[in-house]
Swiss-Prot record:
Protein family (similarity comment): Belongs to the bacterial ribosomal protein bL33 family.
Annotated source species: Arabidopsis thaliana
A GO MF term: structural constituent of ribosome
Protein name: Large ribosomal subunit protein bL33c
Localization (cell): Plastid, Chloroplast
Length: 66
């Protein structure tokens, strides 16, 4: 039997430039991706470069709390 918490957890990645540039009302919305991470290999917050359809470019998406 497995003890403790699950090793793999589901996380949400949110575009950091959309959150900061909320003044720009042309593209209303914040890009979010759902993925999984291994808690043992990456204990810190995850940041990945993903495509944001609201910014029309690749930006840094950071892990947020649920």
């Amino acid at each position: 039997m497995a003890k403790g918490k699950d090793v793999r957890v589901t996380i949400i990645l949110e575009c950091t430039s959309c959150v900061r540039n909320d003044i720009k009302k042309e593209a209303a919305g914040i890009s979010r991706y759902i993925t999984q991470k291994n808690r043992h290999n990456t204990p810190s917050r995850l940041e990945l470069r993903k495509f944001c359809p609201y910014c029309y470019k690749h930006t840094i998406h950071g892990e947020i709390k649920k």
